[in-house]
Amino acid sequence: MRSAEEKTVLLCALDDDLEGLKGILERTFTDDAAQSENILWEKDEVGRNALFAACMMGRSAIVRELVQNGAADVNELTARGYSPLHCSAMWGQLDTLKTLVELNADFQAINFRGEKAVDVARRYDKLDCAEYLAWAEAKQNLQAFIQEVRAIVADQEKVQGKLNKEDKNICINTCSAKSDWINNTRTATAQDFIEQKKLLEDVLAPVLLKLNAQPEASMKTRKN
C-alpha cells in the first residue's frame, strides 16, 4: 500500500490544491528517480493520472503547474488515444481547454474513433468547447503558415537562386501584415482566420511555386 505522500500529486489534482502540488513537486524532484516516477505517474482506480484527472475536473492551475514543471506531457495519450484536450472537451471544461492550448496541446491528436478534441466536444454537445477549439485551431493554422513562410525565406540554402529580393520582400511584408492583423483583430472568428490564411496562400503561391522550380543554370547544365 502506498503512503499518503506518494499519493499527494494525484490528490492535489483531485482536491484542486495548488500549493500542496507545488510543495510535493519541489520535494519530488530532489528525490531519487524511481521514487519520483512513482509519485508523478500514480493513477486512480480507473487509470487516470493527475493530469487527466485535473483536465476532467477543470483544474486549470493544476494542469499548468504539472505541464510547466515537466511533471506531465500535455500531449500524452491513453490506450484508446484520448489526450488531455479530448478529456477537457468531453467534460466541457472550457477554461482548461484554453490552458491546454496555451501549453501547445495538439489539435490533431485523434482517439480510437478517429476523433479530434473538437469532434468529441460536438459528440457530447459541449458546443462552447467545440466553438472555441475550431476557433483556436483556425488561428493556429494561420500562425503556423506564417511561421513556415518566414522560415523558408530565412533559409538561404533553400531560396538561393530561386527567390530574388522582391520575392523575399513580398513574403516578409505579407506575413508581417497578417501577423499585425492577428494581433489587432480582437473579434476574429474561426472563419475569419480560415479566409485570411486562404488570402495569404493565394498571394504567396506564385512566389512559393518558384521554390519547386529547377534553377535556370541547373536546367541548362542538364540539357548540355
From Swiss-Prot:
Keywords (A to Z) from UniProt: ANK repeat, Cytoplasm, Repeat
InterPro entries: ANKRD_45/46/60, Ankyrin_rpt, Ankyrin_rpt-contain_sf, HSP70_C_sf
PANTHER family to which the protein is assigned, alphabetical: ANKYRIN REPEAT DOMAIN-CONTAINING PROTEIN 60, USHER SYNDROME TYPE-1G PROTEIN-LIKE PROTEIN
Ranges of the ANK repeats in the UniProt entry: 46-76, 80-109
One Pfam assignment: Ank_2
Function of the molecule: May play a role during cell division.
Record note on disruption phenotype: Ankrd45 mutants are viable and show no apparent defects. However mutant larvae developed enlarged livers when induced with liver specific expression of Kras G12V, one of the common mutations of KRAS that leads to cancer in humans.
Highest taxon listed in the record's lineage: Eukaryota
Designated name of the protein: Ankyrin repeat domain-containing protein 45
Compartments reported by the entry: Cytoplasm; Midbody, Midbody ring; Cleavage furrow
Entry keyword annotation includes Repeat: yes
Species this protein is from: Danio rerio (Zebrafish)
A Gene Ontology BP annotation from the UniProt entry: cell population proliferation
One CC-aspect GO term: cytoplasm
Tissue distribution of the protein: Widely expressed.
Transmembrane among keywords: no
